[in-house]
Amino acid sequence: MNTTSAVLLLVGLFAVIFTLSVPIGIYMSAVFDGTLSQKFPWMYRVESIFLWPLGKSGREPMDWKEYCVSLIALTVVGTVIGYLIFRFQGYLPYNPLNFKGLAPDLAFNTAVSFSTSTTWQGYDCENVMSLFSQAFGVCTLTFLSSSTGVVAAFAFARGLIQSRDPSLGNAWEDMVRCVLWLFLPLAVICSIIAVWQGCTQTFDAMTVVKTIEGPIQKIAVGPVASQEVIRVLAVTGGGFFSANSAHPFAAPTAVVCMIQIILMLLMAASLVFAYGRMTGNVKSGFSILFGMMVLFIGAFMLIAWSESTANPLVTELGVSHGLGNMEGKEVRFGTLLTSLFATGSSASAAGSSAGSFDSMMPIGGGVSLWLIQVGDVIFGGSRSGLYTMLGLAIVAVFILGMLVGKTPRYLGKRIDAYDMKMVCVSLLMPSICTLIGTAIACLTPQGVDAVSAPGPHGFTQILFAFSSVSNFNGSSFGGLAANDFFYNTALAICMWICRMVTLTALLAIAGNMASKPRQMNSVQAIQTDGPVFSFMFIMVAVLLSMITFFPAQSLGPIVESIQLFWGYHS
């Protein structure tokens, strides 16, 4: 690995992210606290057009139960509409290739995937999805489901700043503001840049070209740029093509690839800054952001080092390994940029890919898997990233309080037993679904038959799939043939349970916090804006994930690495 190139790449990446996250964070806080709508009355009137069908309930404050029910109801409606679109796409317009409707189990899995913002894709995207399904099914659900995660994060922040006021805002108002004033403007701007760089944006289904050898080739096209931008901006990852960002029409240049990496991390950084402004403690937000950055850099260096290492089985064949492990990677990106993309995708729960996770070296694949298993925490973005991070922050404050004998308070709110129970529920549910789902798959013929390689690599394929859907990531080891009734059903159940349980538990914490008095500057308070808190935040994230998943990782990537470097070359 070229260390200088890696360091310069990281410095440039974070310089751009921090430069952009401050103004975007200020803008986001103005959007969600209503300042922008008050300053520009026309924006309020536009919002009212979309909220008109709801009447007064579109503006009235909600407690946590009403807020939660509204978001769950939207998710249910999105799932039903998505299922109908995917199931009956053969009868809908914009289907020039006459694709039939998806099978019931696949349509169910896909609808749940995009309505919960997981965007797991167990199908060959451009070869089974009509343009209508891509543009009006996949893309629309991406906007709505991602907005659900953002508004839930701001509802959590309101719970921390309210004092004896159970209101968390209005879910419908927040959703409209998120889509209209946050995602749509950014998506339009970035889509124009993507088209300029070579991404396709058309309602033609394919383009016919004559190859150098002479035969005619049909290449799938469509409204790619608009979908590719929102999937990375909203940190969902559901691509137009099966190859995702490795496809030359999705990321035609290294510039587009780098922009996609920036967008994956930008929303998370902006959310943290906006959270700090809303709570009146920007330093606390930066403490969390610093912890996220440390974990990200460490993971990237491990993955980049692993992928710069030659595969010993390939070296034995006399193949030059000067470029590192190039299997499953695009030459236009190389190992370094692909490693950075994989780190950003796994850490931010974007689920995108610019190369094959299945072809990574065991350490690289294992670190990517661990980033997913940490739980949408490191630059978690618009899915459940911010409110999951705040859940970990509450755990860190609680542990610090126990260590020093102080009352655990976070931003002036006392942390009680109810808060800790709900945090435990939200943090443990994805782990439970991951491990139980993996165990069931390994014990059933349907689960085992889907793997492409026996032994530890096949186990990693299964573990990666259930880790991905339970933590709202959506990426996968491509060698797992997951488009069957068993995996479509099992993975959809995991996605649904984890989304509903974590969302409900963390909004319950927000409601409980909102009803408490806020006592700032208490002598019993623990500082949450310094290096000690950042260190504890990092330790909690690392230790919780390692304690939970190290045994499973030992059976997969760790054993595979030992076999690869020592087992065959002892």
Predicted features and spans:
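Membrane-proximal intracellular helices of multi-pass ion channels
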Residues: 2-570
